[in-house]
Amino acid sequence: MTAIADSAGGAGETVLVAGGQDWQQVVDAARSADPGERIVVNMGPQHPSTHGVLRLILEIEGETVVEARCGIGYLHTGIEKNLEYRYWTQGVTFVTRMDYLSPFFNETAYCLGVEKLLGITDEIPERVNVIRVLMMELNRISSHLVALATGGMELGAMTPMFVGFRAREIVLTLFEKITGLRMNSAYIRPGGVAQDLPPNAATEIAEALKQLRQPLREMGELLNENAIWKARTQGVGYLDLTGCMALGITGPILRSTGLPHDLRKSEPYCGYQHYEFDVITDDSCDAYGRYMIRVKEMWESMKIVEQCLDKLRPGPTMISDRKLAWPADLQVGPDGLGNSPKHIAKIMGSSMEALIHHFKLVTEGIRVPAGQVYVAVESPRGELGVHMVSDGGTRPYRVHYRDPSFTNLQSVAAMCEGGMVADLIAAVASIDPVMGGVDR
């Protein structure tokens, strides 16, 4: 907050200006320009076209964007700091809420880091890896559907918005049946998953894939060759390979330059090397190319999910080492709150040593050897990386997320400066930022 004293016309006046970062320099530069030619406009943080609480500081001349800056931090939640006060397993509940449109990717990246520090990456059961891939690819479909639905809505295409959200409900219903929650389920755990798939899960997933085909086809029929849609997106938000490399851009934006960069292929994890799928690219470098990549990636994700159903074999859903395995067979009591009498009897009926170990595991958590690792997964928005540091205790010393939304937002100026204000809406929609991941 800055106080500016002004004595225009002999009357003293104090103006309080709320600013952040280089906001004052932006205002000073605008004031020094010729009067009536350029104005500074705040687009957001409460604006329907900024995908959340994103603030865009625009300097415009007529309808042309001369300068564009991003103002972030309005959704800061302190998740990374909170992780330092929670056990390693409890951290999953926090990280799943970062990028809230792709929670399974947040959870998987975190768990892969913990498992790498523990040195148990190769001990993860095969069924666990298949379930993780299954959930991530279903999550990729639901995330892309939101990107296309909201992007269409912002450009005036209301029907694709209804189609996209209706299709997303199919996926979220699956998540609820498998994990108990539609979003932020904390289902992926270090060493495995919280619980096995329900008995009829494979049948329901296969049926959901059949239901998804119609809305995906309908989305393509509505937009792929739509003249208005192409006019609003082709040649808009242009960013070539050189710009992407300079800014560290990943995901559909990078692949729209023709570079087939996908961590599922270049640095496989969770057994992705055993799945057949194509890395979708485009060479248009614009918003339309990114749209087409997301449309085609949903079909590739469906292919991967079908392969997951074929690979599902009976087996454990948690590592066998009981010193590390979080109790994953909890049963809810008849009141829906506490543990069931059957589960309590199982714990209390075991040996005293087993009971003590169970108590210490739940109340103190596991100890992770000292060290630091970096792991990354290919999220719907690009490279989601985790830098994890352990001091040998039961809590993380530091966990830092490299969220693709944060990095990709750096391209707003390169995409939008020199273009029209209306085209800025399409450019930001093609970036598909999620502010929960940006601010954390």
UniProtKB/Swiss-Prot annotation:
<protein>
    <recommendedName>
        <fullName>NADH-quinone oxidoreductase subunit D</fullName>
        <ecNumber>7.1.1.-</ecNumber>
    </recommendedName>
</protein>
<dbReference type="GO" id="GO:0050136">
    <property type="term" value="F:NADH:ubiquinone reductase (non-electrogenic) activity"/>
</dbReference>
<dbReference type="Pfam" id="PF00346">
    <property type="entry name" value="Complex1_49kDa"/>
</dbReference>
<comment type="subunit">
    <text>NDH-1 is composed of 14 different subunits. Subunits NuoB, C, D, E, F, and G constitute the peripheral sector of the complex.</text>
</comment>
<comment type="function">
    <text>NDH-1 shuttles electrons from NADH, via FMN and iron-sulfur (Fe-S) centers, to quinones in the respiratory chain. The immediate electron acceptor for the enzyme in this species is believed to be a menaquinone. Couples the redox reaction to proton translocation (for every two electrons transferred, four hydrogen ions are translocated across the cytoplasmic membrane), and thus conserves the redox energy in a proton gradient.</text>
</comment>
<dbReference type="InterPro" id="IPR022885">
    <property type="entry name" value="NDH1_su_D/H"/>
</dbReference>
<dbReference type="InterPro" id="IPR001135">
    <property type="entry name" value="NADH_Q_OxRdtase_suD"/>
</dbReference>
<dbReference type="InterPro" id="IPR029014">
    <property type="entry name" value="NiFe-Hase_large"/>
</dbReference>
<keyword id="KW-0874">Quinone</keyword>
<comment type="similarity">
    <text>Belongs to the complex I 49 kDa subunit family.</text>
</comment>
<dbReference type="GO" id="GO:0005886">
    <property type="term" value="C:plasma membrane"/>
</dbReference>
<keyword id="KW-0813">Transport</keyword>
<dbReference type="InterPro" id="IPR014029">
    <property type="entry name" value="NADH_UbQ_OxRdtase_49kDa_CS"/>
</dbReference>
<keyword id="KW-1003">Cell membrane</keyword>
<keyword id="KW-0520">NAD</keyword>
<feature type="modified residue" description="N-acetylthreonine">
    <location>
        <position position="2"/>
    </location>
</feature>
<keyword id="KW-1278">Translocase</keyword>
<keyword id="KW-0007">Acetylation</keyword>
<dbReference type="GO" id="GO:0048038">
    <property type="term" value="F:quinone binding"/>
</dbReference>
<dbReference type="GO" id="GO:0051287">
    <property type="term" value="F:NAD binding"/>
</dbReference>
<keyword id="KW-0472">Membrane</keyword>
